[in-house]
From Swiss-Prot:
Its main location: membrane. Residues 1-28 form the signal peptide. This is Putative lipoprotein LprE. Keywords: Cell membrane, Lipoprotein, Membrane, Palmitate, Signal. Coiled coil: none annotated. The keyword Membrane applies.
Length: 202
């Protein structure tokens, strides 16, 4: 009886061993376990490549601003400043143009406003689309608006720098002769503005 059973057992054991061997071979060759993934990369090659790329790249500039140097001059408070917020504030508070009933445009047409002059002025116009809008001068003493005691300044449309000094402003208006302008000088006498003279100019 022992000889009868031994042959089939051997055959079944051989069959099982063959199945195990084939499945082990298939598992070793699966797509998730490739020979490329198992091939080690020498660490010295990768590190050397990365360090070469980093060292050859130019260093980025720093975004921090350079500190100001002592050679940079401060803003001059005595310089002409037609963009001063004082001008816009004063102009916004003026009575409207009597001819058009419109407010005044806060952007000066001309002027020499600064905070240090005994007398300075800006020329403004009515905020209208008229061909010849009303113009006027606004006078300042040490950068502060002079609201009272000022002669009529309507109609002036420019400043003559040749006749203007630290305490005198020469305002101009067109004359009846083309190309000629008339200058009227306003002077700060220490207490108020006074009219000096009319001078015809070119």
């Amino acid at each position: 009886m022992r000889d009868v059973w031994s042959l089939p057992c051997r055959k079944s054991l051989l069959g099982v061993a063959a199945v195990v061997l084939v499945s082990g071979t298939l598992t070793g060759c699966s797509s998730g376990d490739s020979t490329v993934a198992k091939t080690p990369v020498p660490p010295s090659t990768t590190t050397g490549t990365i360090s070469t790329i980093i060292s050859s790249a130019p260093s980025p500039p720093f975004a921090t601003a350079a500190p100001p140097t002592s050679n940079t001059p401060p803003d001059d408070p005595c310089a002409v400043n037609l963009a001063s917020p004082t001008i816009a504030r004063v102009v916004s508070e003026l009575p409207r143009d009597p001819r058009s009933a419109q407010p005044w445009n806060p952007e000066p047409l001309a002027g020499n406003y600064n905070e240090c002059a005994q007398l300075s002025a800006v020329i403004i116009k009515a905020n209208t689309n008229a061909v010849n809008p009303t113009t006027r001068a606004v006078l300042f003493h040490l950068g502060r608006f002079i609201p009272q005691g000022v002669p009529d300044t309507y109609g002036f449309n420019g400043i003559d720098p040749a006749q203007t000094t630290g305490d005198t402003v020469a305002l101009t208006y067109p004359s009846s002769i083309d190309g000629l302008a008339t200058a009227v000088r306003f002077h700060w006498n220490g207490n108020a503005v006074e009219l000096i003279s009319n001078i015809a100019g070119g």
